[in-house]
């Protein structure tokens, strides 16, 4: 099997993946700020790095996968105050909702899922190190800030120079900062902060800045120098750039070897975002589409490419996934183990080892489905299920997928018992040689989105289309 190659944002190129410790991978992914339901952009991040950790394990690595939860942040505080509830009540509620969404999408839980509020002492310890090393200072307003000009390599991840940032970036003015580009490490408490929003420190009561949270959790749980750090493309700057500055400023060593970023989700060629009002929650999508269809919609696009969200693309994903399940419908897979020397498995592995190239890997699944349709071969059916399983797909009994009702069918379509009753009426019509009535029932069912397949021996199977 070829070596895994990953596009490293830091190097701006694909690189052969070499872990720091042979056979082991330590990976940190920036998780979700829990003040609302997860949206499609979150779904993409969750699925992408679920695929990455699944593949790393499939090729034999022992993986420690950490994905954090941001449970203290200005948006969280504002929402809790608006709702008249405690911060913990709000965050616990949306963490539970996030876990429900993840389960629906087939996301395997990370090995460690730290909450920011569990690591306040470690954050303060890192801030004190930065102060000792000359990178941090307490401003007149009580905030502790990071002095970006003290870090010689600032901008190495994003490719942004400090001079360009000063000229072109929108930086919030703050007279207390030594430089407008400096960012906050510790926010001094405000008089109207609600309970649970601040902690005691040598700098006074306050709370951590967003960037220090991930630096402290990553270094504490995975060590000061680890293999992979991932997140959405929108986090590359300033969040991940600031993480590097903090972590390397505190420890004096390389923070992360490989940086991976998934692309944006777009609607009509614009980035999906709350500010534009064009975003959809996972729950809203799952009211209309099966969760595996949503996962497949994400999987079949390369993780670094833009993902264009539309009903047309989701409908196409549903039709494509239906083709894969249909190929397995009447073939019982054999029980042999996956053999990476099999040609389809080799092509699948080559694709996944080429920067997690899921479009090519999915194409291999359709090659297998086509051959199964021609040959009804049990070993090919087994390969299809095994390889798709590595992507978190095709885990259900085919008829369970093909006969399920989602979206419009669920809201106003025929229930399974109604369909079976009409099939029975059609069988009776055929037995009475009333073929016109039998054809009418078939057409009526097709109009309702139900396709019939007459099998040898007189039985009839159905599926939703």
Swiss-Prot record:
One GO MF term: ATP binding
Protein EC: 6.1.1.16
Metal-binding as UniProt keyword: yes
Reactions performed catalytically: tRNA(Cys) + L-cysteine + ATP = L-cysteinyl-tRNA(Cys) + AMP + diphosphate
Binding site residues for Zn(2+): 30, 214, 239, 243
GO cellular component: cytosol
Protein location: Cytoplasm
Main location: cytoplasm
Cofactor: Zn(2+)
Motif annotated as 'HIGH' region, chain positions: 32-42
Pfam families in UniProt: DALR_2, tRNA-synt_1e
Listed HAMAP family: Cys_tRNA_synth
Subunit organization: Monomer.
PANTHER family cross-referenced by the UniProt entry: CYSTEINE--TRNA LIGASE, CYTOPLASMIC, CYSTEINYL-TRNA SYNTHETASE
Family: Belongs to the class-I aminoacyl-tRNA synthetase family.
Name of the protein in its database record: Cysteine--tRNA ligase
Organism: Burkholderia ambifaria (strain ATCC BAA-244 / DSM 16087 / CCUG 44356 / LMG 19182 / AMMD)
Name of the gene this protein is made from: cysS
């Amino acid at each position: 099997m070829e070596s895994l190659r990953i596009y490293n944002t830091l190097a701006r190129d694909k690189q052969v993946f070499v872990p720091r410790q042979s056979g082991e991978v330590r990976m940190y992914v920036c998780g979700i700020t829990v003040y609302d339901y997860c949206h499609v952009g979150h779904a993409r991040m969750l699925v992408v790095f679920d695929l990455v950790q699944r593949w790393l394990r499939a090729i034999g690595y022992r993986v420690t996968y950490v994905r954090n939860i941001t449970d203290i942040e200005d948006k969280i505080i504002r929402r809790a105050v608006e709702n008249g509830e405690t911060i913990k009540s709000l965050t616990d509620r949306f963490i539970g909702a996030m876990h429900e969404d993840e389960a629906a999408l087939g996301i395997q839980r990370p090995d460690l899922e730290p909450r920011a509020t569990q690591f306040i002492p470690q954050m303060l310890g890192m801030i004190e190190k930065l102060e000792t090393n000359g990178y941090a200072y307490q401003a007149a307003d009580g905030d502790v800030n990071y002095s970006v000009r003290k870090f010689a390599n600032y901008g190495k991840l994003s490719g942004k120079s400090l001079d360009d940032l000063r000229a072109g970036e929108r930086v919030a003015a703050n007279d207390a900062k030594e430089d407008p580009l400096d960012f906050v490490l510790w926010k001094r408490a405000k008089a109207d902060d609600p309970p649970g929003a601040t902690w005691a420190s040598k700098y006074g009561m306050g709370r951590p800045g967003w960037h220090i949270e991930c630096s402290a959790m990553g270094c504490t749980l995975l060590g000061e120098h680890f293999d992979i750090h991932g997140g959405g493309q929108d986090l590359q700057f300033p969040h991940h750039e600031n993480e590097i500055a903090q972590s390397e400023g505190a420890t004096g060593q390389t923070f992360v070897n490989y940086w991976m970023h998934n692309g944006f989700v777009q609607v009509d060629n614009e980035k999906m975002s709350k500010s534009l009002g064009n975003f959809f929650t996972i729950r809203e999508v799952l009211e209309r589409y099966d969760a595996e269809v949503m996962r497949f919609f994400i999987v079949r696009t390369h993780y670094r490419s833009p993902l264009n969200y539309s009903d047309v693309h989701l409908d196409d994903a549903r039709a494509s996934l239906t083709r894969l399940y249909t190929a397995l419908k009447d073939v019982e897979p054999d029980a042999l183990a996956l053999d990476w020397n099999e040609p389809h498995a080799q092509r699948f592995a080559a694709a996944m080892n080429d920067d997690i190239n899921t479009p090519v890997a999915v194409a291999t699944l359709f090659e297998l489905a086509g051959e199964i349709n021609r040959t009804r071969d049990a070993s090919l059916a087994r390969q299809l299920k095994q390889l798709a399983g590595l992507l978190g797909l095709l885990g259900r009994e085919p008829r369970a997928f093909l006969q399920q009702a989602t979206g419009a069918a669920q809201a106003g379509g025929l229930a399974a018992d109604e369909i079976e009753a009409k099939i029975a009426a059609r069988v009776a019509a055929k037995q009475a040689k009333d073929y016109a009535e039998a054809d009418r029932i078939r057409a009526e069912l097709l109009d309702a989105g139900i396709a019939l397949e007459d099998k040898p021996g007189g039985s009839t199977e159905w599926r939703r289309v």
